[in-house]
Amino acid sequence: MDNALCYLQHLKDERQFIFGILNDNVREINIAKKEIKQLREYVGILQQNGFTGEALVSQMEYSMKIKKIKKLSSQYDINSAENSSGPYDFSFIGNELTIFRERLSNYSSWGVMHSIPSMPESIYIYMNPIHQTDEVDIVYQGSNDNYSYLIKKNGRTASYEHQITLNLAKDAVKKHNLREATKQRIVNNRKVNFITKYTEVTTNGKTDQLAVPLFLLHLVKTATGYKVSYITIKIILEEQVESNVNIVEIDTGVEMTNAEVNAIITGLLSRMMMVTNFVLGNSMVHRRMLRQFIGMQVKVIEGAYVINSQKGAGSNLLSGMYGQGVIATLSSLATLLESTPQTVKPNYVLNGIHTNDIEQKEYEVSSILKYTTNKSKDRKVGLAERISNINKPYSVTMTLGKGNGGILAIREYSALKFNYDYPDQLDDIIPSNADSSRPDAVRMTMTKTQSNNDIKITTTVHIILDITDYKDKKVSEGVIHTTLRKSGIYVKLEAIHNQTRSEAPGSLGGTDSLVSTTLCGIAQVHSKTSALSELSNNGGVDFFDGDDVKRDNNMCTNRKNFCVKFTTTSRSSPSVTLDIKSLGKRYKGNFPMIIQRVVDLTGREAWAYEAQLSSITMDNVQLRFGSKQEISIKETSQQFVYDDNGIIKVKYEKTLSGSVLKDGSKITTVIPDQKFNSINDIDNILTSRNQRNLRHRDVPWTGANNATAKYNGFRDDGMWGRKESGLMQYNNEDDVIIPIAFLGYTTSGSGGSRYILREYDIERAQQLMHTITRRDRSNTRQGQKNIYVRDGTSSGGYVANWHAMKTSMYMSLPGKNIMIKNVEINDIQELVLPNGVYDQILLSATNITLWNSVLILNQYVVYIKELAEDNARRLDVVEKTLNKVIELHQTMTVTPEETAQEESGWDIAGRIFTMLGAVVGMFFPIIGASIEVLGLVATGVGSIQQGHIVNGSLELTLAGVATVIGGYKLQKRLRQKYTLEGIKDSIKIKMDKLKEKFGTRVKNTHIGKEDSNNGVSTSTNKRSIGKANNTLTGTTDIEIVNDVINGQSAHITKTTYSQISPELQDCYRELDALLELTGNVEHWPSGLNLATAFDIRLTEKIDKIGKGKMSINAIVHGEQRTAEVNDAVWSKCVGVKANVEDYTIIRSAYVDTVQKEEMINVDRDIIRDIYTANGTKIVEKTSVGINSNNVNGKEYTVTQDGDISQLEHVITSGTVNDQSMQLIIQRCVLYYSELSSSPSD
């Protein structure tokens, strides 16, 4: 009896435990409701402040991600080895890093840093070539507290044209004739031998140095993902440290713990590894190469502080954020080493930012990976600690054959460099030690040296690149001919040109100091169809020397330039020819060759040739050209603006609510409601409203008068362009120029120092948009004007460029999250998702999942080839998941009467839908979500509201997946073990069987199972437990109706829970609401039956406290379920949950959209827009085609002309059969393929 009483008390305690969990869930629901309410209010506030379209979406995305990081950090153990095998490496979202970021946010009054990984912008860092015939001295002068260098040429202080780039790799020191003392001080085993850029000495007696290890700059940007251009890195020159452990000293003006330092390092390294996986594909050589860099020695990385440092102002970087005019992006690496930061002022920054009257200190770059740790058993070893074995000093050289060697930059591209000083020596780029089995291979070598006292270990990694069409390894007439192979690499040609002061149309004069950082512009070939066809038709694009060729459209008037000729031999085998011979006659130096992979909409390689041109001028560093990936679009009545993340559409006949800029910026200026027919009308409106500063064309141009310059306005492809003489121009009138950024300069006059601010935080940028003013600069030459972002505190201001106002921070990655919750916008045309999955997408009242799928299939084909070919790790995960699908499918073929399982075939079907959604969602997240919605509908789990019914999406989705991956390795590999048709048919057969058995009403019953030890029969027949009113029964009425696509679909007519314990009824009702609101993401595995999911949650909770596995029924209703019971259902449920959670992070944002209030919908308007935008029409063929493709006896096909109304007929008539829709899908893909490869007429 005592035992029985104890057991009853035990059950009572367990029940209290369960109710505690339920109450927690209710609280979570209320919090979720509150958050949604706040979110809607927030959207309203944003709209009232002018945020619309992309700006609104980006702001919403930013806000939601800040909240989500807290949940992510709690859900993921960042140091767990298991998590590293997931689709992303989330180790950088550690609790420590979260704490650190939140702490930093207290000192940065405009928000926490972004927390979702993103690919960095191109980091254009260039070396200024040293004239080989000149002897260059770098004279060390200064004391232990203040290191400075004089750069002398032939014994004289260097003039402006003689900026110098030091390649501090050991072998390169000799080439530059450096003095021995300098060599010993800078290049030794304890110093990191990266290329370091120095500016020259000015003539007014002040010394302005720029010392930035270029690769470290790239590392910071890549690791943080923050769009911060100006991160300066101090090189510490100090005496030998006695201890072998160099403690990382990081000072943000606030106390930091070792864990926070650990988090910073871990975030840095994990992001580097993540970027490696995506950028460098499956090349283990590349990955090995990058892992070498992870061991680099970093002690101080100073963040992008941009300070209005008039004399005596802003000395403390972290005090008076607005009062001192500090505009900074505190990345996770934005730290200062000095113990007294208020005495430190930055005196060197990149790309036009400059300060004056600043004390200079340089520091040794030392290890960040060795630090003291507490190895207690309750602490998990961090990533930084695990890789501490590679933290030794090393040098890096990357050489292409016998050229000058040295590493130019390792950004998101691989970088090569070869020397073209002497065209007759160009065959040197073929290494003598080339792989004998691959005679056409060029080898790039990276060497890492690990030094331990007197022992040095050198590791060399070779990166092989194919270069063909060499005649016996000889290059005739100095022309390098590189065939771009199928591996997805294209050549980006870069060249640097330094200006002399005398070449500038105006000079700074007086005591103005100039930051002579070489700035390279980028010009890209654009056409109505594709860069490839443009090159084919025009025989290449020439960039002529302004001194040799005079044209109306010449680029670089009165400026020395260089000649680059692009030619193509065939569309199937594109190539780039660089006329080095003519180049070498006039110009000596290193010509960097950048290799990048680009994929177009069809999954093929897109060869968007582009040359990078320098555009520095002495009087004002003003302009840079930008290039984006070319996406071929036919000319229509629409106009387009390209950005990193897709296409922004501008319709002339529509009323705009804002002006859209080339680089994706959204200037939230409201244009009066009126129709306009040309860009000139917009121009007039903006001008009349004194908002000329919001237009791209107001970027200053050297050699042009803004007041009289005429512009072409939108080109055929929507870019901004002009014909008048400017800094640089294309020669071909169809080509366009894209000014996306300009730089300000500094002056030591009474106006104080002025700085350019590039690419800073979204929220701050949007705040500043409202305070942009335009005013003239009295000391600006040639009447040029700059745009200032005022902080309202002093006469100084900040020059902001358009790139800084870019509102979308994240580039597209496979499986990238989109987070949109209840977005309400004024103009339905303006919503543009930020990650380029769609050309455009609208929220509307209806949901046409069919076209949702068509859009995804057309857009995501960009990524599927890369994933299928380059990511074996993900493929393994997919295969494991599909194994689970097959396992569930096999289980599903057993009827409930044949097994002791406590769920019906419908439950298993729902889980198959869930798992299938998880698999598909890895590549097509929205389709994966749609499959899960279909699973909810078909299996009667969850409550589906009107308008959310998915008609036949499973058939289309599976067929679409097969279409997309057709011909690639993934399909070939999967076909060996699974067939999509087989899975699809099996599910259909089982559903048919269930319909035969249950009719159109399926009763879904969940009843607990009893242990025979208690004397209860173990018969497989369903039976209730205890009293009737304690039986937990869920009943779902499913109506099977005909479907316009595949003839059948399931609709939920009613879902009820009957005979539930009264104390549980409200809880289940709340949980239903929670499922609708959150899409199951944060709380339950998607698609599982509610009660099953509930049991899983409770079972796991109970497991944690060692009470054994017990069902919710058994616990709540006082029935015993011992831990010894080997119940397949529960173990399977738990297994499913674990498997699903692996993909929850990827799919969460997409599933979030499948909720009660809003879904991502596509209606006829967007269909019309998509097809119109691409010049695609649906036309009725005059003759009847194949019967299987007929619609009411008429065949509809996709062509490049015709009446769009036929497409509407296909959609609205309800007569489309599955074959015709497949035809449309296939033709869409074919159309993109033809568009990117066919020549332009």
Swiss-Prot record:
As for subcellular location, the record says: Host membrane
Ranges that cross the membrane? 261-281, 918-938, 947-967
Chief localization: host cell
Coiled-coil annotated spans: 21-49
Region feature Disordered, mapped onto this chain: 1005-1028
Is-annotated flag, keyword DNA-binding?
no
Keywords associated with the record: Coiled coil, Host membrane, Membrane, Transmembrane, Transmembrane helix
- Any single GO CC term annotated in Swiss-Prot or TrEMBL for this entry: membrane
Instruction: Provide the topology term for how it sits in the membrane.
Output: Multi-pass membrane protein
**In which residue ranges is the amino acid composition biased (Polar residues)?**
1013-1028
Q: What is this protein called?
A: Uncharacterized protein S3
Which organism was this protein described from?
Diadromus pulchellus idnoreovirus 1
Gene name, Swiss-Prot/TrEMBL: S2
